[in-house]
């Protein structure tokens, strides 16, 4: 085992040559994504999208890494361990009565699940010129962080490029046909949040909404079986009776709490073209080239401030981001994006060699054959794909990578799409130093500093101790109490010394 560790370390260090790879590193496929898991991720460390690469209907599923349910006042803090209770649990454990100790801990020491990372919405692009596609290819070039879709339809060649720019904080989509007036498309937003509304203006399409003020993924039956109704005053009255028949509350259902969000989408014609914008969406026609600039913003204003009462105006922020990006043409936007991205990505070159036949295969076919056929170059590609995801998902000023990076389609995602800080968060950042991406750790270090603030309150109120403490899970609201109903996980503590481990591993 130690020999394997040495070999892995040698390979990682040998990869850091500082010379960029000669050939583009590309994941590619010969058909559109059939579901979210097959779509291609792009991101700029704050905004992200999953690109499906459709022909008749294209879809970009959108995320912004501050969009969460809840707010600071929704954080459950009513847990206090008395010295007598502490001594009793320790005594039971010393006596080997682990089940009794566990039951006591579940009843008195644990909080509840933290709040949830939320999807922003979807951008849909309808092709109004139907026809069978030929020569189809969609790809993600991780050498320059650009997703492309190319195909022919009715004898016309279409090319689509999408990227998420870190320097300009926008997502850019460029469409081109090789025939005059070849493009006829309609675009609109949707969102899983019932509060979201679409509005057209003279020059742009806007999506505005509010995330849920409270979400709970545990079922009513689980909560009641555990006797945890008192931990959920949003759902239960003082007598433990249900106030709602649902576990996701919006707006007036939760006293107006919840984070506001807004997206603004503007089309730009490098040459001629026609555009109609209404509340129903955007219609683009009579052109062979158009690009779109998409900005996204939320009312998040810090882990300790209410986004509904003390939040940033997402409309003003999204408009400001968009106006700055509009000062550049498409080629300049793309150049600024690729130069910024490659300043990080090109620090490492890692080449393993496979046959030309293997390299010519679509990536999904290569993965299918990998188990029984040596394909070293695919391993090198996946190594670089990991670095791509780090750069795309974690940049200074943003939030750390959560359990799904920055990409999530579900309002109640698996494990809350949170930060599991007893191991998974650390694992996300293990490659950062070894693969020469030190800057990408800044969001993690800032989260630790913020946890020390909420963690000092938990140390004082829960344990009657100085210093600070965090347990096994947190979110953008920097919860530091033990949460949920699983004591062997919930009580995984990250006090000051383990926080050094969290920082350095």
Descriptions of predicted regions:
Residues 2-9:
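Sec-dependent signal peptide recognition
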Residues 14-15:
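C-terminal motif of bacterial Sec signal peptides marking the signal peptidase cleavage site
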Residues 18-490, 504:
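Aromatic-residue-lined binding/catalytic grooves and analogous aromatic/hydrophobic interfacial grooves
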């Amino acid at each position: 085992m130690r020999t394997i560790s040495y070999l892995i370390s040698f390979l990682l260090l040998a990869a850091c040559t500082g010379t960029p790879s000669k050939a583009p590193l590309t994941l590619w496929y010969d058909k559109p994504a059939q579901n979210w898991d097959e779509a291609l991720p792009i991101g700029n460390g704050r905004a992200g999208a999953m690109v499906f690469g459709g022909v008749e209907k294209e879809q970009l599923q959108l995320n912004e890494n501050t969009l969460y349910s809840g707010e600071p006042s929704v954080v459950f803090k009513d847990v206090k361990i008395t010295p007598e209770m502490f001594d009793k649990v320790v005594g039971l454990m010393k006596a080997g009565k682990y089940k009794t100790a566990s039951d006591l801990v579940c009843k008195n020491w644990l909080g509840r699940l933290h709040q949830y990372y939320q999807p922003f919405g979807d951008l849909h692009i309808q092709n109004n010129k139907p026809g069978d596609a030929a020569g189809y290819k969609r790809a993600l070039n991780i050498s320059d962080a650009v997703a492309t879709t190319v195909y022919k339809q009715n004898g016309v060649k279409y090319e689509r490029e999408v990227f998420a720019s870190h320097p300009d904080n926008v997502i850019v989509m460029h469409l081109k046909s090789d025939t005059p007036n070849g493009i006829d498309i309609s675009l609109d937003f949707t969102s899983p949040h019932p509060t979201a509304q679409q509005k057209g203006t003279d020059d742009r399409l806007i999506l505005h909404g509010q995330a849920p003020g409270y979400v709970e993924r545990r079922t009513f039956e689980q909560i009641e079986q555990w006797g945890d109704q008192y931990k959920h005053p949003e759902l239960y009255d003082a007598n433990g009776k249900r106030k709602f028949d649902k576990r996701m509350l919006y707006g007036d259902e939760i006293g107006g709490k919840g984070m506001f969000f807004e997206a603004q989408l503007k089309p730009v014609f490098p040459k001629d073209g026609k555009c109609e914008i209404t509340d129903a969406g955007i219609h683009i026609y009579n052109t062979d080239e158009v690009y779109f600039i998409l900005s996204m913003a939320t009312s998040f204003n810090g882990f300790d401030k209410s986004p509904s009462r003390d939040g940033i105006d997402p409309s003003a922020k999204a408009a400001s981001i968009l106006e700055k990006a509009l000062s550049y043409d498409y080629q300049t936007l793309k150049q600024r994006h690729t130069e910024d991205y490659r300043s990080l990505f090109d620090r490492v070159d890692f080449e393993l060699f496979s046959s030309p036949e293997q390299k010519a295969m679509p990536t999904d076919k290569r993965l299918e054959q990998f188990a029984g056929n040596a394909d070293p170059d695919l391993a090198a590609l996946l190594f670089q794909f990991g670095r791509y995801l780090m750069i795309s998902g974690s940049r200074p000023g943003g939030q750390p990578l959560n359990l799904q990076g920055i990409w999530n389609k579900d309002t109640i995602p698996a494990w809350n799409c949170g930060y599991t800080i007893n191991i998974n968060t650390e694992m996300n950042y293990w490659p950062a130093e070894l693969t020469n991406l030190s800057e990408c750790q800044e969001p993690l270090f800032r989260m630790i500093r913020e946890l020390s603030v909420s963690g000092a309150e938990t140390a004082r109120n829960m344990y009657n101790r100085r210093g600070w403490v965090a347990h096994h899970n947190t979110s953008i609201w920097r919860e530091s109490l033990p949460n949920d109903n699983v004591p062997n996980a919930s009580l995984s503590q990250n006090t000051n010394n383990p926080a050094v481990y969290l920082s350095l591993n």
